[in-house]
Structures are given as structure tokens and as C-alpha cells.
Amino acid sequence: MAFKVQYMAMAQRRKWMILALALYWPALFVLAHIPIPAVVREANISDKGIHFLVYAILTFLLWSAVGPDSKVTWRRPGGWLILAAVLLYSLCDEGLQHFVSGRSADARDLVADLAGAAVALGVLTVFSFWPAGAIVTAMTVYMLPVLARRNLMNLLPVMTTVFYVGGYATFTLLWTRCLRSPKGARRVGWAWLAASVAGPLALLAATRISAKAAGRPFDRWDMLAAAMGILVGVLVAWT
């Protein structure tokens, strides 16, 4: 019975990962093959950092759609096939840049793409789905404000708010799934609440400190949106 429940949960998780991949990959393709919007240029975000992040996310989603409850094992072909697929897509992606106004192929972008894929697969080699998802999400919400040289909240207030709320809510949910409670212990209580917010608050503090150290804008509105995301994540995990 327990195995059946676990199998059904894994199948449901795979469906969600396939749906996420079906939405993410086409969106990534479209955004990479249109002229760079003026607001993106104004934000002055590190291009190589963005390549690293989006390919790390793509690789995580690809693997999770194939084996949502297993780690990458390099003795089997799965990890190598995912890496080959990402490499092939990255080559096609860079090749098509010649046909887009204002864009050009760059070998350094390819290196950043492969670095993102390699890091994601490395994480998936060590960790299973929930902690791996938490790490990839943490990388995303940590790196974006550090990479942006302009205040994203001023340039794109709605999108930036959605990003922080959604990103920190997702991380909080994944974080709570990684917490282990003694058998029979109550899921909801002060100890559970403290453990649930400890990781997200540590991530928020690290992002704030790193952004300030790098001279990047990460102010009270950014932190408020992130705190809202943490609250949403805790409330969803609680129910």
C-alpha cells in the first residue's frame, strides 16, 4: 500500500514537471530569439549569469520530467542523454542568434549554458528531487538580484514582485519538504515554524548581504516581496 501511494505521488510529480517543462522551454526559446527588450538592456543584467541560470533550470526540469524521484547515475545513460540534449539545444540556440536583430552567437554563452547544465546535474547526482529543487530555486532567487546592476523593482515592479513572491514561496515549500520530523510528531508547531522559516530567511539574508557587497540594489521593497513569498510558502505547507 505504501509503495502504491509513493508511486502515485511520483507519477503526479512527473506530470507537474512535464507541464512546467512544456511551459518553460518554449518560453525560453521565444525570449532568446527576439530582439533584447530595452528594459532588459537598462537592467544591465550579466548575460552569462542569465545563461547559466536558465540552463540550470532547464536541465533540472528535463531530468525531473524523466526521473522525478531518482538521482543522476553516471553509469547509466540518462544523465549523459540529458547533457547531450542540452548541448545540442544550446548549439542550435547560439546558431539561430545570427538571424535575430541585435543578437549574435557567442562561444562564452555556450560555456555558460554548459556550466549551468553541469551544476544542475551535479546537484541531481548528490541530491534527490526535493533538496535538488530547493538548491536550484535558491540559486535563482539569490543570483538574479546580484547579477542586476539596476533596481529591477523600479524598472519592472509587477514582474519583480511576482518573481520574489513566487521564488521565495517555491523555495519555502521545497525547503519544508526537506525537513524531517520525528515519527508521530506534529507537523505544525513552533519548532516546525522555526525550522520552516530558518532556511528561507537565511537565503534572504545572504542575498541582501551579497547584493549590498556587490553594490547591487536590493532594498526594502525587494525584501518585503521576498518575505511575502516566505509567508505564502509557510501557509501553503501548513495546510
Locations of regions flagged by a protein language model:
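Active-site-adjacent scaffolding segments
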Residues: 89, 93, 103-111
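Bulky hydrophobic segments
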Residues: 2-92, 98-99, 118-239
